[in-house]
Amino acid sequence: MNFLDLLKEKVVIFDGAMGSNLQALDLSIDDWGGPQFENCSENLLYTRPDAIEKVHSSFLDVGCDVIETNSFGGSEVVLAEFGIAEKTYDVNRKAAELARRIAGDYSTSDKPRFVAGSIGPGTKLPTLGHITYNNLKAAYREQVRGLYDGGSDLFIVETCQDLLQTKAALAAIFELFEERKVKIPVIAQVTIEVFGTMLNGTEIGAALTALEPFPIDVIGMNCGTGPKHMSDSFRYLCENSPLPVSVLPNAGLPEVKDGQQHYDETPESFAAQVDHFAKDFGANIVGGCCGTSPEHLKQVVERVGGLSPKRRGAKLVPAASSIYFQQPFTQD
């Protein structure tokens, strides 16, 4: 069974946070590879791959169907900030190989496990003039190649804050497909902030209109906020997207308590809201983002693990989009 077959059969459950669960391991400066690499989780692939393996295994242990590679910050743009841009291909290949090996250890004929090659937004957004579109697309190429060559079953372009950034990542993926004459599934996920749009002001309707024409397999939302603040935008996506839809919320909004970042959604409250997204809105893929622990995902698996996808009957509104708004093609 491949990933798209599984998506037709059940609500697919992705893993939770990599970063906050690595932080919970209380790694030393030496573990990170020195002060210059602190919080560069990709460098742990060289210094403490066992820590990455521990996080992956913790989510597979509770029943998640898909784990994401430890490559969210693995683009050439981000790695250049740590002085390791030349390792971009190797970092991403290692991340995918490690995840693929662990997923293989857990996979059975009755419960296959899959690896999603994670591609984050990076630190430079073209719409804000930080980087040109062409340079950003070029920076994604080595990441995409490494994730594919390492054995990723699908790509997930996630936490997208800028439609041009999203398109650059997707273009790099589809160029690889054309070059290699291959195809694996692609998910595109945008981040809607508490003020109701993407970081640069794009509303969810404009994001759907702009991204749906790409040959992606799933469109969705992740990060930014907890499930409460995602509800209206995700409902819109479920009611209007002809594609399968995904939602991977944070464990609420972060706040600092006693010098530590804390998220306010308990595993039980988080799972209840994710269950609502699947049963009532028709989410095809659920999972967690920042602050979500294996316990959060265990509760999600218990509530959602046996669900079949809900028929949504969504109908895409013919429209054009600017960087900010959707303009439907309607006549009076």
For each feature predicted by the language model, list its residue ranges:
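Domain-level signal for soluble alpha/beta catalytic cores
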Residues: 1-332
